[in-house]
């Protein structure tokens, strides 16, 4: 009996030692969505982003993911119009790190393989020259009809450059400081109804 008690005590002691040496490891991450609400059904041109952008650094590729950013375009028809043109132009695209480093990232915007630049308009629809807008073709067909016409399409967004401190460019994103960058990517849309 004493041997059984001693054996049970030894097994319990070894089991207790194993538990005492093990430590729980936990990790936590937070996902954040931007949230605003707006309704505009009376302006001649309304462009609504259908989501927000979140770029994540991937160690395996030493870079950031790219994202498709969808948008909805609504226009008011003009029965006197004989042609319609829709263009886009990049306004802002800098994300700044939320610490004291001053590190920045520049976001590139592409529409159907063409870069949307700050210095020139990107033609999305130009009915006079046969550019009918791909996924936005409903606008090319409805610009001179009464009422409103809507269509959806998307830009491809990607991180195209970065700095460690606001001035020193990086060629290897793995050298960027750790942290979170924040900012706005704004694209201006211009619509022209020609009568």
Swiss-Prot record:
Induction: Positively regulated by EcpR. It is found in: Fimbrium. Its main location: other. The keyword Cell membrane does not apply. The keyword Isomerase does not apply. One of its GO terms (cellular component) is pilus. Keywords: Fimbrium, Signal. InterPro entries: EcpA, Fimbrillin_EcpA_sf. Residues 1-22 form the signal peptide. Self-associates. Forms filaments. Interacts with EcpD. Belongs to the EcpA/MatB fimbrillin family. Part of the ecpRABCDE operon, which encodes the E.coli common pilus (ECP). ECP plays a dual role in early-stage biofilm development and host cell recognition. Major subunit of the fimbria. This is Common pilus major fimbrillin subunit EcpA. It comes from Klebsiella pneumoniae (strain 342). The gene is ecpA.
């Amino acid at each position: 009996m004493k041997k059984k008690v001693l054996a049970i005590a030894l097994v319990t002691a070894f089991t207790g030692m194993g538990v005492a040496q093990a430590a729980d490891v936990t990790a936590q991450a937070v996902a954040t969505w931007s949230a605003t609400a707006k309704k505009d059904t009376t302006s001649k041109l309304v462009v609504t982003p259908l989501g927000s952008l979140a770029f994540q650094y991937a160690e395996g590729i030493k870079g950031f993911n790219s994202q498709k950013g969808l948008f909805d375009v609504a226009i008011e028809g003009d029965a006197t119009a004989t042609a319609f043109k829709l263009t886009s132009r990049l306004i802002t695209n800098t994300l700044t790190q939320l610490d004291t480093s001053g590190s920045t990232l520049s976001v590139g915007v592409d529409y159907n393989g063409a870069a949307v630049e700050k210095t020139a308009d990107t033609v999305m629809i130009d009915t006079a020259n046969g550019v009918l807008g791909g996924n936005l073709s409903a606008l090319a067909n409805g610009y001179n009809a009464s009422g409103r016409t809507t269509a959806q399409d998307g830009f491809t967004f990607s991180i195209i450059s970065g700095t460690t401190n606001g001035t020193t460019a990086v060629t290897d994103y793995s050298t960027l400081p750790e942290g979170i960058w924040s900012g706005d990517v704004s694209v201006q849309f211009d619509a022209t109804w020609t009568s």
